[in-house]
């Protein structure tokens, strides 16, 4: 279907305006003086800025397009995103403020930094960093996929989609390199306001356009597709999958490097705590998005590509102006999270692989430059991977959730378990990753989310093996800050 020139022009104007704001956000040279300034804004962001930043970070184009696609094909299974995010914020309320305090005191900018200092182990920090980077690349690729799909629908017949996508991501890489976290933070405000306005507009107008209201729409859905409103009791995505997927996704949410980056920008633990209370408001948007998937199921032809369901629904329902604002919102929901993810991945690579393993005596100025420069490598890899393996992206991202949750014991559990040892934690992490991938490859999940099997193996290994190594456990400033000083501890003990 031919694109709409008016919609394409509006999309381009909004996106380019936001990119310019991203560059302007970094006009103050202080944003590039250190890794801490560039990646977490010197930890000076108030509660409202953090709310916009983390919201932009976690609710991406993949959230909107992916949830609509899931609702379009699987019905109510898509609602797993609601309990998982509510549960995630409930859990985060208890551990994120403690983690923020440790990061603030010891000037940590990544979760791998915390693992290194908490356990005196560069090995564990490197594992956390490797998992974080490898799992994040496909997630960045999905943002590429989101803007590519948007431009494909909006610009068919007018532009070379791949060329424009590449240019868009180069611009994002440039403003991220230049402005650091300040770029996506200030542009996130625009993106999030657009998300709320456009989604509310769509959820009110679409039922009126196609069914004369919500009640007739629900009645039509009940009559024509009642299976869309129930969760299967068994099968590969039955109730056990729904429950375990919600639990694993909740535990994994703040293990992602970009989520931790957003949290570490806060100016106080109280700001982090308040965000855990108010971030669930974004679930209102998620509920609306799922119902848009139901509307798409009723309105669009059966052979519609589920991935493009929301975009085609917009295309067939609105004129050029409304299409333009909707497409721009989805495009920004691709580009802005991509920037934050690139910062998170670059930080992990530069701090926890380059500095910790390759060049431990690197100067702060050079480390800052290396960290900033890695943005181009990360986004370049994501572009390359997305172009070469487009069909593997969703699978890899879903597997990424199962992989990321395996660092939960090393990060969140260790904030509360004083005698947790690095040896048991490393073995548990490796066991969890191995079990997750074996279950996935052999397709032996038995209706349970793959990451749940891995996390179970991980925790069992840590609990069983920890007593074997606890006598070797030392102390350090992080442990003393969390649990108080330990008598007879050897603070100079170093790990692998």
UniProtKB/Swiss-Prot annotation:
Induction: Negatively regulated by TnrA under nitrogen-limited conditions.
Compartment(s) of residence: Cell membrane
Entry membrane topology: Multi-pass membrane protein
Keyword Amino-acid biosynthesis recorded: no
Main localization, broad class: membrane
TM stretches of this protein: 5-25, 45-65, 77-97, 127-147, 161-181, 193-213, 239-259, 278-298, 325-345, 374-394, 396-416, 424-444, 450-470
Gene3D superfamilies: Sodium/glucose cotransporter
UniProt keywords, alphabetically: Cell membrane, Membrane, Transmembrane, Transmembrane helix, Transport
InterPro entries tied to this protein: Na/Glc_symporter_sf, Na/solute_symporter, Sodium:Solute_Symporter
GO biological process, one term: transmembrane transport
Record carries keyword Transmembrane: yes
One GO term describing the cellular component: plasma membrane
MF term (GO), any: transmembrane transporter activity
Family of this protein: Belongs to the sodium:solute symporter (SSF) (TC 2.A.21) family.
Protein name stated in the entry: Uncharacterized symporter YodF
Naturally occurring in which organism (per UniProt): Bacillus subtilis (strain 168)
């Amino acid at each position: 279907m031919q694109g709409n020139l008016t919609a394409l022009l509006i999309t381009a104007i909004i996106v380019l305006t936001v990119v310019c704001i991203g560059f302007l956000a970094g006009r103050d040279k202080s944003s590039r003086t250190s890794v801490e300034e560039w990646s977490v804004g010197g930890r000076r962001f108030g509660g409202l800025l953090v709310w916009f930043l983390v919201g932009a970070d976690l609710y991406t184009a993949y959230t909107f397009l992916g949830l609509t696609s899931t609702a379009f094909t699987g019905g109510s299974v898509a609602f797993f995103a609601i309990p998982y995010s509510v549960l995630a914020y409930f859990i985060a309320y208890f551990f994120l403020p403690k983690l923020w305090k440790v990061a603030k005191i010891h000037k940590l900018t990544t979760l791998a930094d915390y693992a290194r200092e908490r356990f005196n182990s560069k090995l564990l920090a490197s594992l956390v960093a490797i998992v974080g980077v490898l799992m994040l690349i496909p997630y960045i690729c999905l943002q590429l996929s989101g803007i590519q799909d948007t431009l494909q629908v909006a610009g068919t017949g007018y532009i070379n989609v791949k060329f424009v996508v590449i240019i868009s991501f180069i611009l994002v890489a440039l403003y991220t390199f230049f402005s650091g976290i300040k770029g996506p933070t200030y542009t996130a405000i625009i993106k999030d306001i657009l998300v709320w306005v456009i989604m509310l507009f769509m959820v009110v107008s679409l039922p009126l356009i196609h069914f004369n209201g919500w009640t007739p729409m629900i009645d039509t859905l009940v009559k024509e597709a009642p299976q869309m409103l129930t969760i299967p009791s068994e099968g590969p995505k039955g109730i056990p999958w729904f429950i375990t997927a919600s639990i694993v996704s909740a535990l994994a949410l703040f293990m992602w490097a970009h989520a931790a980056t957003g949290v570490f920008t806060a100016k106080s633990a109280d700001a982090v705590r308040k965000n855990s209370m108010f971030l669930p408001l974004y679930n209102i948007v998620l509920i609306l998005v799922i119902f848009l998937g139901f509307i798409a199921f009723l309105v669009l032809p059966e052979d519609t590509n589920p991935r493009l369901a929301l975009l085609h629904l917009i295309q067939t329902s609105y004129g050029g102006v409304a299409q333009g604002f909707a497409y721009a919102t989805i495009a920004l929901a691709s580009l802005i999270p991509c920037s934050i993810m690139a910062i998170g991945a670059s930080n992990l690579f530069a701090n926890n692989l380059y500095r910790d393993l390759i060049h431990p005596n690197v100067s702060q100025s050079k480390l800052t430059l290396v960290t900033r420069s890695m943005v181009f490598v990360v986004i370049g890899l994501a572009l390359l991977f997305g172009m070469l393996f487009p069909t593997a992206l969703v699978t890899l991202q879903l597997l990424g959730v199962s992989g990321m949750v395996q660092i939960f014991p090393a990060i969140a559990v260790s904030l509360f378990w004083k005698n947790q040892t690095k040896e048991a934690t490393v073995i548990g992490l490796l066991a969890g990753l191995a079990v997750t991938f074996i279950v996935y490859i052999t397709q032996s999940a038995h209706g349970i989310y793959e990451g749940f099997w891995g996390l179970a193996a991980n925790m069992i290994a840590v609990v069983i093996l920890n007593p074997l190594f606890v006598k070797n456990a030392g102390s350090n400033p992080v442990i003393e800050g969390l649990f108080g000083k330990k008598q007879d501890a050897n603070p100079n003990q170093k790990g692998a």
